[in-house]
């Protein structure tokens, strides 16, 4: 039995899983308190601390042999989607935080530690920096500024593969609009196995979300920034974490918001409907990218558990394509499946050092 260790580091947790033959043999989420992490100067310095806990997990499950180790991909250079072999250039970029710091940077670093111990390869799959934008999609409208591809690539691509399989097709044969509904919302136009355009909420595109602003009237927002004398870090925090439903209702949890609506709160109802309205508009935008040839519109992420949200969006876009709902996320399984496709020869592992994105 070829067992794969999956490592998914978060800011205050490390999710671990063991997979074989498409089955999850064991899964555990290790929680890290603020006090435990306080002594560490940065994310990378937590390597030994987390490594010890992972070693204990493997010992508990009597793991003496592995086929491979896979970690969540961190902040790297923009690269096409796929499964990448962890190499020295990747490790150097992560250890030096060349492209910024994030807990996910530990994914490849920790995967490499255990890959060396078990004498097996280490991989990452579809990191957040996946960039498959077609050249026209990079144009922003102002010389000197390019649009970026940032979104929930791992979950978007994994769910798209699952829905394609359900439809009797491969991901590479299909066209999908994938909508990841969470605290942040991202949309992707998936065309024959590539995410050729996105709605990047992190940079202030698209619909408002439980905590993000989405697209704002630029002149009014610029005036607001000047009047409030905001720094660039404050602007980023505002549009990516303190806007949307949080700014209108003081709440980001859709369960609480829906309870307010059930109790007769018309204001909550108004702004939740507004969010769904804007999401539907962005789905229409992605439909244009795919020129109307769409196998399905896929709604995924935590907010896809909300029947209210799903219904509000669906009734506006069912004329475009069939709606498929896949609530939650499947990151751990997606990491395993990416590696399994390489181990079985279905795909070839990609080389990070040689990876380049399509520009013009």
From Swiss-Prot:
Q: Which InterPro entries match?
A: Aliphatic_acid_kin_short-chain (IPR000890), Aliphatic_acid_kinase_CS (IPR023865), ATPase_NBD (IPR043129), Butyrate_kin (IPR011245)
Reaction(s) catalysed by this chain, per the record, are: butanoate + ATP = butanoyl phosphate + ADP
Which PROSITE patterns does this entry report, sorted A to Z?
ACETATE_KINASE_1, ACETATE_KINASE_2
According to its UniProt entry, one GO biological process term is:
acetate metabolic process
By its UniProt entry, which Pfam families does this protein fall under?
A: Acetate_kinase
GO MF annotation: an example: butyrate kinase activity
Principal localisation = cytoplasm
Q: Which EC class is this protein assigned?
A: transferase
Q: Does the keyword Iron-sulfur apply?
A: no
- According to its UniProt record, which protein family does this protein belong to? Belongs to the acetokinase family.
Protein known as: Probable butyrate kinase
């Amino acid at each position: 039995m070829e067992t794969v260790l999956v490592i998914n580091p978060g800011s205050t947790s490390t999710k671990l899983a063991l997979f074989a033959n498409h089955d999850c043999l064991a899964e555990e989420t290790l929680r890290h308190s603020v006090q435990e992490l306080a002594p560490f100067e940065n994310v990378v310095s937590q390597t030994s601390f987390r490594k010890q806990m992972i070693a204990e997990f493997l010992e508990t499950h009597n793991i003496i042999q592995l086929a491979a180790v896979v970690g969540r991909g961190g902040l790297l250079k923009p690269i096409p989607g796929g499964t990448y072999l962890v190499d020295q250039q990747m490790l150097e970029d992560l250890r030096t935080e060349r492209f910024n710091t994030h807990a996910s940077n530990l994914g490849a670093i920790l995967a490499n530690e255990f890959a060396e111990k078990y004498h097996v390869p280490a991989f990452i799959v579809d990191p957040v920096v996946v960039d498959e934008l077609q050249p026209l999609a990079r144009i922003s409208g102002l010389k000197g500024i390019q649009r970026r591809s940032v979104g929930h690539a791992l979950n978007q691509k994994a769910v798209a593969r699952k829905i394609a399989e359900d439809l009797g097709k491969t991901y590479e044969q299909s066209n999908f609009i994938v909508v990841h509904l969470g605290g942040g919302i991202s949309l992707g136009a998936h065309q024959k196995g590539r995410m050729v355009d996105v709605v990047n909420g992190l940079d202030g595109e698209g619909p408002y979300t439980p905590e993000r602003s989405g697209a704002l009237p630029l002149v009014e927002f610029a005036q607001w920034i000047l009047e409030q004398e905001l720094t660039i870090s404050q602007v980023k925090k505002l549009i990516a974490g303190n806007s949307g439903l949080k700014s209108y209702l003081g709440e980001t949890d859709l369960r609480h918001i829906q309870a307010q609506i059930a109790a007769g709160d018309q204001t909550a109802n108004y702004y939740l409907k507004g969010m769904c309205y804007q999401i539907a508009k962005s789905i229409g935008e992605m439909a244009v990218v795919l020129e109307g040839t769409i196998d399905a519109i896929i709604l995924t992420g935590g907010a896809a558990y909300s029947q209210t949200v799903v219904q509000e969006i669906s009734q506006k876009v069912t004329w475009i394509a069939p709606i498929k709902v896949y609530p939650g996320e499947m990151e751990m399984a997606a990491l395993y499946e990416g590696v399994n496709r390489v181990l079985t020869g279905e795909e070839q592992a990609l080389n990070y050092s040689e990876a380049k994105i399509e520009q013009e």
